[in-house]
């Protein structure tokens, strides 16, 4: 199975690319969706986060007020690192199970959409790595327009993440999203061809079909050995 790593930065257009993969019929494991699930009221992640940040981050329903929590962690490096440390084990296990589900369903190619792909060292498990890149100027402009943030707040959120230039240097494939939506679509079509190329032997053996092939070969080999033993 080919596990494609997709990452970018806030307001880079990564979610748009993720949706394009979905529309093309390629399964996507979304770390943000997993993160929302592990923060649901009463979950292990919810308990640890509430214990660390207090009940003031909760809505009247008891669910985490995500915008409020975001304001807290984006204004403090130490609090952001604490949140990442608390959530990492739950998110990693959640992503693993989602990948396992796709493997069990017979998927040959999947995309793992992880904003912190390099930061949490998940890049070692994905190939190729696709980075959606924009200039910092474009990133700030889009973030302010999208979320109605001041330049200072937008800059704090951008600076809280690994620089996109650093991510670009580690990528196998770079999608430059500084242009129009049409430009993005044209680049995506080229990426799609790369993603859908035939599996390597290693990728094939990691797939469900490859595992069944190995199992079938073992069973056949044992059967032949048994017949030879009986005939001797």
Curated annotation (Swiss-Prot):
The membrane-spanning stretches of this chain are: none
Show the GO cellular component annotation of the record. Answer: chloroplast; peroxisome; vacuole
Q: GO molecular-function annotation terms?
A: ATP binding; dephospho-CoA kinase activity
What's the catalysed reaction? 3'-dephospho-CoA + ATP = ADP + CoA + H(+)
DPCK domain spans which residues?
A: 3-206
Q: InterPro entries, from UniProt? A: Depp_CoAkinase, P-loop_NTPase
Q: Which UniProt keywords apply?
A: ATP-binding, Coenzyme A biosynthesis, Kinase, Nucleotide-binding, Peroxisome, Transferase
Q: Which CDD domains match?
A: DPCK
List the PANTHER family. BIFUNCTIONAL COENZYME A SYNTHASE-RELATED, DEPHOSPHO-COA KINASE-RELATED
- Family that this chain belongs to: Belongs to the CoaE family.
Annotated function? Catalyzes the phosphorylation of the 3'-hydroxyl group of dephosphocoenzyme A to form coenzyme A.
Q: What is this protein called?
A: Dephospho-CoA kinase
At the highest ranks, the source species' classification is:
Eukaryota, Viridiplantae, Streptophyta, Embryophyta, Tracheophyta
């Amino acid at each position: 199975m080919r596990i494609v790593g997709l990452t970018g930065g806030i307001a880079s257009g990564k979610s748009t690319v993720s949706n394009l993969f979905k529309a093309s019929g390629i399964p996507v494991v979304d770390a943000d969706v997993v993160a929302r699930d592990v923060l649901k009221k009463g979950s292990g992640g919810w308990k640890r986060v509430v214990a660390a940040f207090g009940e003031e981050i909760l809505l009247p329903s008891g669910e985490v007020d995500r915008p409020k929590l975001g304001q807290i962690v984006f204004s403090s490096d130490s609090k952001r690192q604490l949140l990442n440390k608390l959530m990492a084990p739950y998110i990693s296990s959640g992503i693993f199970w989602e990948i396992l589900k796709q493997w069990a369903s017979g998927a040959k190619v999947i995309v793992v959409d992880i904003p912190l792909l390099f930061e949490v060292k998940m890049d070692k498990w994905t190939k190729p790595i696709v980075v959606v890149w924009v200039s910092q100027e474009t990133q700030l402009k889009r973030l302010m327009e999208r979320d109605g943030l001041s330049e200072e707040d937008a800059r704090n959120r951008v600076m809280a993440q690994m620089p996109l230039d650093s991510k670009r240097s580690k990528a196998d494939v770079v999608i430059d999203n500084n242009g129009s939506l049409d430009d993005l679509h044209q680049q995506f079509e080229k990426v799609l061809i790369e993603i859908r190329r035939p599996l390597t032997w290693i990728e094939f053996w990691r797939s469900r079909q490859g595992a069944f092939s190995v199992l079938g070969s073992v069973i056949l080999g044992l059967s032949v050995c048994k017949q030879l033993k009986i005939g001797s």
